[in-house]
Amino acid sequence: MNGTRLFELDNRIRVVHKRLRHSRIVHCGIMINAGTRDENKLNNGVAHFIEHAAFNGTERRKAYHILNRVETVGGELNAFTDKEKIFFYATALKTYAERVLELLVDIAFNATFPQKEMLKEKRVIHEEIDMYEDMPEESLF
């Protein structure tokens, strides 16, 4: 597979790894195998909500510290949701690979979803929905 390795850990987490020797950056991601396809009338929007809310704190970090952990070294942290998955990802210099991966694991497995932040996230998601509804080309996909 083009130098790409796929293996499964003892806890059944699958890992895809590809090393690019010439590159000085690392791009890491954690994919949660659940998306909008798994929603129904009772939990409609929950995947997108989790994507947003996971950045609001973990057992070890407040929201500010999550973003700061990658941005202070010139990296980028983001996420997206689609029908198949929730994907948390980060890009940084290779030197910071361990820092980036540790942060992604913390977000994916230790998010706390602080109650006081949830209403803010709900508003942000509604603003995103309004933005997409103003873009007719989005309805084609």
Language-model regions: role of each:
Residues 59, 66-141:
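Acidic/histidine-enriched segments that form metal/cofactor-coordinating
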